[in-house]
Amino acid sequence: MKDKGEHYKTYGWTCSETNLNTLPDTAPEGAHKLSEWLTLQGRRTSLVEWLGQCKDDGRIHGRFMHIGAWTGRMSHQAPNQANIPSAFHGDPKTAVESVKHRYDGPMRKLWCVDDGNYLVGTDAEGIQLRILAHLMQSKAYVDAIVTGKKEDETDIHNVNKRALGIPHVTRDMAKTFIYAFLLGAGIPKIASILKVNRTQAQGAVNNFLESIDGLKELKKKKIPHIARRGYFTGLDGRKVKVPNEHKTLAGMLQNGESVVVKHWVLEWKKAAEKEGLDFKLIDIVHDEVQVEVPSMEIAERLIRIQKESMNRVRDNLDVFCPLAVSSDIGRNWYETH
């Protein structure tokens, strides 16, 4: 049997859980069973890995590489916390979703704090779309992010939905679309998200590029120029080399996210330490941090400090779009993200 590396070189794809999750309903039953099995295998592998990494103090001490990815994002090892799936919400409609519904929530609950302590989970709210607004220098996009409301359909995902120009597209479909689009998804993938044929998917992308202020110029002019030059300059002034045009926009968004989050962590930690708060930073994953504290009072004060600190980061880095955070307090990771 070929390993994944050989298989990718030969066929251009691998038989992975991620790829099999894109199977259409019309795929053979055997393919769906294989997808279910791979999902179960992945959950079992994670549990075995976690048990093996648990130390005498009952904790897992993972490793962080602060610029482990080419974009400047952190990478993680032993275990890779970035690959731990979020809990599945809603009614499972496939065998794979049933596996996720059964296991992913309980697996998140395993990541908890000491008895009596609280976990504060805070993330940089909508950070990649805010970085996109910064790159486009679009006041209209900023307004939708900052002042738009889901209730009256003026929020950013409803704005994106209307920009696609397809009547049956829902807000949730538009939300899935925008992140796939920004990561460089091809027309077949976008067609599957929007539940249209490829011609309609291409038309939707064209509509989107024309409708969103500043996006066409970013995608058609700025990104190709950056790719030809071979690098972009991040929010903190560092030059970041880009491997190719296809990965450039996603790289710029991830780099912006990474720079903002790292500056923010330094800012709120300094402020919390100055106040003498008792806290323990226990995890950073992309746009979120998890912090252990001994009381609800400290948890609430820490959240206020984190919000205030993000405002200073926006000013320090001169980000075009206002930045924001959202927080939850709980006893485990399931409750805080």
Please describe what each predicted stretch is.
Residues M1-V99, G116-Y118, E125-Q128, I187, ...:
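Conserved "right-hand" nucleotidyltransferase catalytic core of DNA-directed polymerases
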Residues D3-E17, M107-D115, R130-A140, D155-N160, ...:
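Short acidic (Asp/Glu) and glycine-rich catalytic loops that position anionic groups and cofactors
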Residues H32-E49, L129-H134, T176-G184, G251, ...:
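Short, hydrophobic/amphipathic alpha-helical patches that form generic packing surfaces
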Residues L302-M310:
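Short amphipathic alpha-helices in soluble, non-transmembrane regions
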Residues V319:
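Catalytic phosphate/metal-binding cores of nucleic-acid and nucleotide-processing enzymes, i.e., regions
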